[in-house]
Amino acid sequence: EDVAFHIEDLPEATAELQQLLAHHGYDDACIYGHALEGNYHFIINQSFSSEAEVERYEALMNEVKMLVVDKYDGSLKAEHGTGRNMAPFVQYEWGETAFELMRAVKQLFDPKGLLNPGVIFNDDPKCHIRNFKPLTLTNAHVDKCIECGFCEVNCLTCGFTLSSRQRIVIQRE
């Protein structure tokens, strides 16, 4: 995920985000980003193989929402677009009036709801914890891949045959 805080809030917000991740058992979480823009990304190792793991993740995201929006008046999406993971929180962050205006604009351009249905505007408050894409375990190195695409342009073999991510997907299939 990527969130944004006001630059003057970064020291306190960073410490609280770290504490929040640790509180929920994400001791190996990685926070990085673009501090001059107040933009942070965080990556966690998350299994969704049990109801307890799904509940842990749901609790984390609810607290991230409150930390970013309520406490620091920040943004739940900074650099990357709103996806299914943040869809349940769009109205919370923007308020009902702005949310309904954005929904109306989407309806004007996509009256049949064909473009990314449920990605930004989703009436299911738990859409971020449903329909997970399971990743087949293959080996210790490949299993760490979260399919973010970073390797696509940074791999030495990029452009020779398959991309790094394509090779990983093939191993998983």
Give residue ranges: language-model regions.
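Flexible glycine/proline-rich, aromatic-decorated loop/lid segments
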Residues: 37, 62-68, 73-79, 160-173
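Activity-critical C-terminal alpha-helical subdomain
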Residues: 88-137
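Local cysteine-cluster metal-coordination motifs and their immediate loop/turn environment
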Residues: 78-85, 142-160
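Ferredoxin-type iron-sulfur electron-transfer modules in oxidoreductases and energy-metabolism complexes
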Residues: 100, 121-142, 152, 158-173
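A glycine-rich phosphate-binding loop feature that marks nucleotide/adenosyl-phosphate handling sites
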Residues: 32-43, 77-90, 117-131, 158
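C-terminal substrate-recognition/cap domain of FAD-linked oxidoreductases
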Residues: 1-59, 67, 72-75, 83-85
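Acidic/polar loop patches that form or flank catalytic/metal-binding clefts of enzymes
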Residues: 73-79, 102, 113-117, 153-156, ...
